[in-house]
Swiss-Prot record:
InterPro entries, sorted: DENR/SUI1_TIF, SUI1, SUI1_arc, SUI1_arc_bac, SUI1_dom_sf
Keywords: Protein biosynthesis, Translation regulation
Species, as recorded: Pyrococcus horikoshii (strain ATCC 700860 / DSM 12428 / JCM 9974 / NBRC 100139 / OT-3)
Family as reported in the entry's similarity comment: Belongs to the SUI1 family.
BP-aspect Gene Ontology terms: formation of translation preinitiation complex; regulation of translation; translation reinitiation
Entry's Gene Ontology molecular function annotations: mRNA binding; translation initiation factor activity
Highest taxon in the source lineage: Archaea
SUPFAM superfamilies linked to this entry: eIF1-like (SSF55159)
HAMAP family: SUI1
Keyword check for Transmembrane helix: no
Keyword match Ribosomal protein: no
Leader sequence segment: none
Protein name (record): Protein translation factor SUI1 homolog
Length: 99
């Protein structure tokens, strides 16, 4: 349950703390015709705009992708770069598991 926050500064601090507590799992899935997708799960879609995070990641990685079903899907294998990029967005690197 999220506490009621009145002060906008408190809300920003609360979101930063939430980012640092997210357990994120990154792995790949095989799609049709041998194509690969990088899947990012574990980001709370009620607290964070998955579409906005996906948009930033797609721009940095120069790939296509989407946010659906509570996860982010990126075209291609980006496991080697995704941990650093999520850390730049404020998520804790220690809580990002890359398979």
């Amino acid at each position: 349950m999220v506490p009621r926050i009145v002060n906008p500064l408190d809300e920003m601090l609360f979101k930063e703390v939430l980012k640092e507590q997210q357990r994120i799992k990154v792995y790949i899935e095989r799609a049709r015709y041998g194509k690969v997708k990088t899947i990012i799960e574990g980001i709370d879609e009620k607290e964070f705009d998955l579409e906005e995070i996906a948009k930033k990641l797609k721009a940095k990685l120069a790939c296509g992708g989407t946010a659906k079903n509570g996860r982010i899907e990126l075209q291609g294998d980006h496991r080697d770069r995704i941990k650093k990029l999520l850390a730049e967005l404020g998520f804790s690197e220690e809580l990002i598991e890359v398979e």
